């Protein structure tokens, strides 16, 4: 009896200890530098892919931006079927249509070429096509799944960091809510960071996606699951964004600034993929889906307000964020001021009301935010009433 009790106690302690274990994961291969896109064919060939399903932003496809990708694949004898993704954030209906087309074309690998919406859609497609008995709504981070198709991610904006995360965000066609799924299988095999493909991104999109990357880095640095690995990536990303985002917005042909933003976005993605995000993302998903607000813009509307809410438990961390953004000694209030200044400098100082938000929306949004997976790692507990107040403050 005593031995059995001792075994049970040890098992209980082991379980508790495992709950405290934190993980850190990144894509197996990340290529960066001007011309890196030219390596796509080689990376596909190395993974035994003979026919790639190329999911591409419809505007980029019409503009002929996939030509370098096509040349790279042709040089290695890899066939391609192009799927122009509809504009806007991905909906499960669009994902299912892409899965059907991939099967019909008999492709054995996926390339995502576009912004975060395209990358998120491609990750879902690569996973669902090999798991036909599964649905995204039923999947969790602990689901046992068949291996997805080989996946190469080529971001054409610097913001989501989706090329280096185990997360995808898809809009549910019935509820209209954003579904956030985290699973190890969603991590791409290869991330290709080539600043040349971001050179033509308009200033407003550059600004919105850049603030999204900043939000990722700040929330990862503040997250409950932060580690020394994620801290180094997040604080480094914050410093790079503070220096490079205004340059990339002000002069889009500054390829050094563009490359720094791609790297910072990737670093922030690596950080939050392991550390988690927080209340800003949990709140931003709700008006973003309901009012079709671009994700980076929704984050810009809410980030300073949420930082003010979290400040009481993040004073030291926020001081480091302020130092990274301003390159001088800062306190927690300085960090929030520096974030507000950067948001204003790149033209993203808007309020929720500017996008059509009304006070009667706040209660339902707050309840949905409480159910959002991103809230798990927020450093301060929030109630529905507090979240309603935060929406009102940002309104």
From Swiss-Prot:
Keywords: Bacterial microcompartment, Iron, Metal-binding, NAD, Oxidoreductase, Virulence
Major location (coarse): other
Disruption phenotype: Unable to grow with ethanolamine (EA) as sole carbon source. Slightly attenuated in a mouse model of infection. Not required for aerobic growth on EA supplemented with cobalamin (vitamin B12). A double eutJ-eutG deletion is not required for growth on EA supplemented with vitamin B12. A non-polar deletion mutant grows on EA at pH 5.5 to pH 7.0 but not at pH 8.0 or pH 8.5, releases increased amounts of acetaldehyde on EA plus vitamin B12. Preventing acetaldehyde vapor loss allow growth up to pH 8.5.
GO biological process, alphabetically ordered: ethanolamine catabolic process; generation of precursor metabolites and energy
Cofactor(s) in the UniProt record: Fe cation
EC nos: 1.1.1.1
Cellular localisation: Bacterial microcompartment
Pfam families referenced in this protein's UniProt entry, alphabetically: ADH_Fe_C, Fe-ADH
Annotated GO MF terms: alcohol dehydrogenase (NAD+) activity; ethanol dehydrogenase (NAD+) activity; metal ion binding
UniProt similarity note: Belongs to the iron-containing alcohol dehydrogenase family.
Function noted in UniProt: Probably acts on the acetaldehyde produced by the degradation of ethanolamine, producing ethanol.
Protein name in UniProt: Probable alcohol dehydrogenase EutG
Gene name per UniProt: eutG
């Amino acid at each position: 009896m005593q031995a059995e009790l001792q075994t049970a106690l040890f098992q209980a302690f082991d379980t508790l200890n495992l709950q405290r274990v934190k993980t850190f994961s990144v894509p197996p291969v990340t290529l960066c530098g001007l011309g890196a896109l030219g390596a796509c064919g080689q990376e596909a060939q190395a993974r035994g892919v003979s026919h790639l399903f190329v999911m591409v932003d419809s505007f980029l496809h019409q503009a002929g931006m996939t030509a370098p990708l096509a040349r790279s694949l042709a040089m290695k004898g890899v066939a391609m079927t192009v799927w122009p993704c509809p504009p806007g954030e991905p909906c499960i209906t669009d994902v299912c249509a892409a899965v059907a087309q991939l099967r019909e074309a008999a492709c054995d690998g996926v390339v995502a070429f576009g912004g975060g919406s395209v990358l998120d859609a491609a990750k879902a497609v690569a996973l669902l096509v090999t798991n036909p008995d599964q649905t995204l709504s039923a999947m969790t981070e602990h689901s046992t799944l068949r291996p997805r198709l080989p996946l190469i991610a080529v971001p054409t904006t610097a913001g989501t960091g989706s090329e280096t995360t185990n997360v995808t965000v898809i809009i549910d066609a019935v509820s209209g809510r954003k579904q956030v799924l985290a699973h190890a299988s969603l991590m791409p095999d290869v991330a290709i960071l080539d600043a040349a493909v971001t050179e033509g991104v308009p200033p407003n999109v550059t600004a919105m996606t850049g603030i999204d990357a900043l939000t990722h880095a700040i929330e990862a640095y503040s997250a409950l699951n932060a580690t020394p690995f994620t801290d180094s990536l997040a604080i480094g990303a914050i410093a790079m964004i503070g220096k490079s985002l205004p340059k990339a917005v002000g002069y889009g042909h500054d390829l050094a600034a563009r490359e720094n933003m791609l790297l910072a976005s990737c670093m922030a993605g690596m950080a939050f993929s392991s550390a988690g995000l927080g209340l800003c993302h949990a709140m931003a998903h709700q008006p973003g889906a309901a009012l079709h607000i671009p994700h980076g813009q929704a984050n810009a509307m809410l980030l300073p307000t949420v930082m003010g809410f979290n400040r009481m438990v993040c004073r030291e961390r926020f001081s480091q964020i302020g130092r990274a953004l301003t390159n001088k000694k800062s306190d927690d209030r300085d960090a929030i001021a520096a974030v507000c200044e950067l948001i204003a400098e790149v033209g993203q100082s808007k309020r929720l009301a500017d996008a059509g938000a009304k006070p009667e929306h706040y209660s339902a949004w707050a309840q949905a935010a409480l159910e959002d997976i991103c809230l798990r790692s927020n450093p301060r507990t929030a109630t529905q009433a507090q979240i309603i107040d935060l929406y009102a403050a940002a309104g």
